[in-house]
Amino acid sequence: MPAQGAPLRARIGFGEVRHKRLAPVEHAFAYPTCFLMLPLRSLRRQPDAVLARNRRAPFGFRDADHGDGRADSLAWLEELLAGEGIADADGEVWLHCIPRMFGFAFKPVSFWYAHRADGTLAAIVVEVNNTFGERHCYLLAGDGLDFGRMLSAAKVFHVSPFCETRGDYAFRFMRTDLAARDECGRTAVRVELHVDGSPLLLTSVSGRIEPLTRGAVRFALWTLPAMTAVIVARIHWHALKLWLKKLPIIGKPVPPELAVSRGRAPTAGATSAASTRPSPTRAERGAVENTASPAQDLA
């Protein structure tokens, strides 16, 4: 996917978010979702007429919802990568994020995929927001970075009052190739939180991807009109359920001094043919039991 090839189109995805807590009590939920998959370098060269960007609309995208709040979120991402010594992310940059609907958006987690000119992955940035208005990014890079490979990072950012700020995230990203301008595909992101060597939280977002069309936008507004508005409500609703299950509330720590923390090198031998495979099968999802309200409990 060369940066100067034919511009790629914005995509929209429809799927499901899933979450399961394993200890000290079990708690699980799943909700339908829609999301955007935006080729930001292509959109910089040729804006998409269907995408309502940085303007009022029932369904759209606002750059200021990401990064440091500037009007060009791609410029922020490029500066972040340059500051971290990643100089070869010269291909497409895809942003997987929740849309802004009817003027509202809360984005617990977004995923930035920065490619080289030959289409390989140079870096993945996991951008996490909490309900206190704070934001932190986990940068995943290094030799062997690829779809389908298990990646990891130490948890340093507070998200849930029912989870301590410790442990390790295990990430696995799967996505079909979107190099063709009008290609459909599938994506799946799985995130596990391990504490003291045992899994505590299992989350995922997966779904089908298709070109962003006016018909697809109408379908999203018709089937999920209140999706972005109820994300925060669902977070508090499930927090109440956990409190009723007698889970102790953990005080909010001071946020990390650095806005970006680096993950570990990809796990050797953890890649598979799933690197470009569609989202997990029902059996795979059942085995992992992931879910999240776009993952506020990326906790």
Regions found by a protein language model. Name each.
Residues 1-299:
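Mature, function-bearing regions of proteins
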